[in-house]
Amino acid sequence: MTGPDPTRPADSPPIDESALLRLAPPLREAFERVGFTADGILAALGTEVHDALGRGEPTPVRRRCRASGDLGTLVRLFLLADDVDADAARTALAPVDPDDAERAGLLERPSGSVVRTLLDVRPLDLGDGNRWVVSDIDGSTREVAIGADHVLGVGHASLSLVRATPTRTDGPVTLLDLGTGCGVQAVHACTYAARVTATDLSARAVVLARVTAALNDLEVEVVAGPWFDPVAGRRFDRIVANPPFVVGTGDVTHSYRDSGLDLDGASRVVVSTAPDHLELGGTATLLAAWIHVDGEDWRSRVASWLPDHGVDAWIVQRDVADPALHVGTWLRDGGLDPRTPAADALAERWLARLEDADVTGVGFGFVYLRRTDRPTAVLAEDLRHGLEDPLGDEALDVFDRLDWLRTHDVAEERYAVHPATAYEDVALPDPEGGWSTVVRRVHRGDGPAWQHEIDADGAAVLAGLRADGLPLADVVELLAAARGVDSEELMPGAVALVSALVVHGLVRPAGSPRPH
């Protein structure tokens, strides 16, 4: 007989779904009255102190809250997870009765004169007005144990998925949020989807997602179950997914990150199954991770998860971590100190499994899918540089551009260089005097900020493109005549260059209805 696994934490404190749902309307009333909103908190704290809050530095925030009245009380209560005077909390939360909040599992009373929160209740603005999200406390400002059923709040992964999700629609759409957690994606989806369904394996996540929707007065269908089981037989216009994709051993210590599947099995399940739940023309935006293995191209690995027919895929790798960095990052994320025996035991198993599988790195990024009625086509790319603009609607544009290339003769079309495209000629001093060009590049100044190295012929071709000018074939003919060569020597390179720049939005076909 074996004892309990020392690496598996206990569950989180209990919550009462019905009681929390009853609290949602009066809690929203209190928040609106006090100004407990993203904009209200920024105005009260100021930029510098607000930045300190984001860094998990509570002292400057506490100092500012002293002069911020009821709003300061709620910031300390919910964002700093401080012990707060019970009378001050009662005033700030009115018309919520703190006793009701205690029975629901929102608050606890460590002593008769103070209360503290058991949940993180956080305002945020996703670009379409204020929302609130209810999750478990993450320990960034108050030391807490991260429970096995911990429901993650608003983090880097969830916000990156928000920015990466297409919101452009041609009419009412249905949307599935797979692995909703606390409901961040579902809340965001309500701004552009007519009907939103959210699923999660975790019973606690289902409750908190329902509470998040109720607190925002939004109608979201939230159902419990693993993977796509709760929506078996159903199809949607859009799917977003932030599943427990962490590459691991198959052990489950935290349900928000561990799928119970070996290595990148969770991402494989989601990527391979999502097309079955898309309407024709529907799209999916999936957060995913994949292993890099000696002797195997990561692009081929992810592409192998897709069916041979019926899918367009754009796979975007945003980062790659070495095994030690990957394991250390997720140990700390789970609240473990890597120096402790429990963390050491887990890290030993984790690193041994990665070594056994010849894993050299772990890739992370987005998989965009579109359901079609033709053979599957896959474009997999590295995009590891920083981005200023959201990636979301770019995916729809990429699919449109690939469609255009399938149905047009590239050489016979007219083009224009996108206005945000910059040309760079880098030259170094020539030993014999003057300057010698060492590299030529074109940069896209918006969106994914792609850049391509080109040669002198490529630069000349791009200089000759005009929407009201000559077809590409004629531009190449003129260039060939000027160079004294046969146009057949230049045409393949010109077609390949223009095709690549069309896909990345640096060049657009004449008459294109969209700028990219």
Which positions does each model-derived feature cover?
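SAM-dependent Rossmann-like transferase core, predominantly class I methyltransferases
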Residues: 108-176, 180-188, 192
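Long, charge-rich, low-complexity alpha-helical segments
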Residues: 70-118, 162, 166, 171, ...
